[in-house]
Amino acid sequence: MLTFLKNVFKKGELRQKIIFTLGILFVYRLGAGITIPGVDIGSLSANDATSGIFGIMNLLGGGTLERFSIFALGVSPYITSSIIIELLSMDVIPALTRWRKEGNTGKKKKDRVTRILTLFLSALQGGVLTYAFDSGYGILVNNSIWAYIYVVLIMMAGSLLAIWLGDQITIKGIGNGVSLLIFTGIVSNLPSSFLQTYDNLVTYDSGMWLDIAWYVLFVIVYLSIVVFVVFTEGAIRKIPVNYASSTGVIMKTKEQTHMPIKINSSGVLPVIFASSVLAAPRTIVSFMETTDVTNIINTIFNYQEPVGFCLYILMIIGFTFFYSNLQIDAQKISDDLKKNGGSIPGIRTGIETKNYIKRVLNQITVAGSLTLCIIAAIPIMTPIIWTQTENASISLGGTGLIIVTGVALETVKQIKTYITRKEYHGYIRK
């Protein structure tokens, strides 16, 4: 670790990239604390206005929605747009499917369409959020159409600015900008969450030391979960690959070439989508009058209830299989291997290679989906099994854990790759 940090600060260009990245993140967090003028933050904070689907948006934004800041939407419109465009490129819209196969040129075209869609989605999300919160909690100081339009425009501008800041990190800094913005938002709430948990668990009476022991045990269990998530995020299945030389003879090296496939190639998207699908009906009925129907909906779509929990788990498994096959195109991998003279030992090139990759992907996705279910279920099951933590509040639940560990591991990997590349180029020049 010390050697790694020494190498990081020894490289002048890398040091500048890290400082630039930290500067952009500081600007983003600064804006996250600025409430939109004309919004009554007191009436918003006094209500449970960040539950359901809004709670997911608030988590990803690091509390920006709870404060109704200029970055209230964060990068969520861009993420939603990216997912929609990616889904439509799966043989739904021919143009998008064609762009997907055109490499960097097609990627630029898709990115342009994604940003246009982001503009419309930010307007839609901003309008829905403002209307919902104003109808339910009266957040607008001046309840006029112009005040409504003004707040929506500020939210749109804030979302586009957040995306631009993320782009600057990706281009001039280190790591994926959008992911780091989400990472910073989630991590920024950790200190207050742990302090709140301490206040909830520890009572200053004769049993204080026992309460402190419970809190220490809680932290140890939490850190153990973090280690488990780090392990699962880095777990891969290696498929051996041989490449033929120009003479047709199989090249043999001391270290066999392999193709790595992550156990959890879908990332956190299945959990976010499953949570959003369950939260949407409850969020809608929360603005309605309480009836038998609304009570039934709240029970069915509440993942803390048996039926809702089963739905939650089933949706995570289904979305994991869907997104894994979306992320890893077996046909494309098979074609690339054939084009470059590569083959999997014992498997014929072409259709057999494609079927083999699909079979392996489905096998490891079973493990990946079950892992996601365990991580997502921990925050739900812990208060039931361990009653002392019933009132504990930790913002970094299963969804946040996967995001934070995934982004952290990917950023460290990029830094290590950068250092290795620079050292290799320096060696070549010598």
Per-region residue spans from a language model:
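N-terminal cationic and glycine-rich segments that engage phosphates or anionic surfaces
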Residues: M1-K430
